[in-house]
């Protein structure tokens, strides 16, 4: 296998080899996540959750938003980080409502070759986009599914060079 293929296989099948996932950090307290949900406001996705400090010490939590896109014509990561937000310092027993907002177009993938019928375009493929919030990629809580009923071009670009004439 080529090095790129080996790396893909390692990331897919050796998840336990990652010692410190993104968002890992030392905390002297614990947090619980509840009421995880999402809503649409025009073309804006809003993921929300209540964070409660259930530990004995004050602390802050960084909430991360992830999206799992549908399988489609374009190759995509299995899950992608789309945003994050830090709570204020929460005293033991204190709760904070957190919202992470991002445009729907941020779910789009780039179609370089025209696999979706749209060459050089950012495309939101038809299907179900699973939405999650959590403290790391290993601790995620489902917020719902955004359903795209059709494939949509969010931005059409123009190619500036022909690959056959590209020179180094």
Give the positions of each predicted feature.
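Short, electropositive, low-hydrophobicity segments enriched in small/polar residues
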Residues: 59, 97, 138
């Amino acid at each position: 296998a080529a090095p790129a293929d080996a790396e893909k296989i390692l990331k897919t099948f050796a998840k336990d080899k990652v010692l410190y996932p993104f968002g890992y950090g030392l905390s002297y307290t614990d947090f619980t996540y509840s009421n995880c949900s999402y809503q649409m406001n025009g073309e804006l996705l809003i993921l929300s959750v209540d964070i409660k400090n259930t530990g004995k010490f004050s602390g802050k939590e960084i909430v991360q938003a992830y999206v799992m896109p549908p399988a489609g014509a374009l190759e995509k990561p299995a899950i992608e980080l789309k945003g994050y937000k830090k709570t204020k310092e929460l005293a033991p027993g204190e709760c904070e409502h957190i919202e992470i907002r991002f445009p729907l177009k941020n779910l789009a993938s780039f179609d370089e070759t025209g696999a979706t019928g749209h060459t050089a375009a950012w495309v939101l493929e038809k299907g179900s986009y699973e939405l999650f919030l959590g403290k790391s990629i290993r601790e995620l809580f489902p917020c719902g599914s955004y359903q795209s009923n059709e494939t949509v071009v969010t931005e059409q670009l123009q190619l500036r060079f022909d690959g056959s004439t590209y020179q180094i």
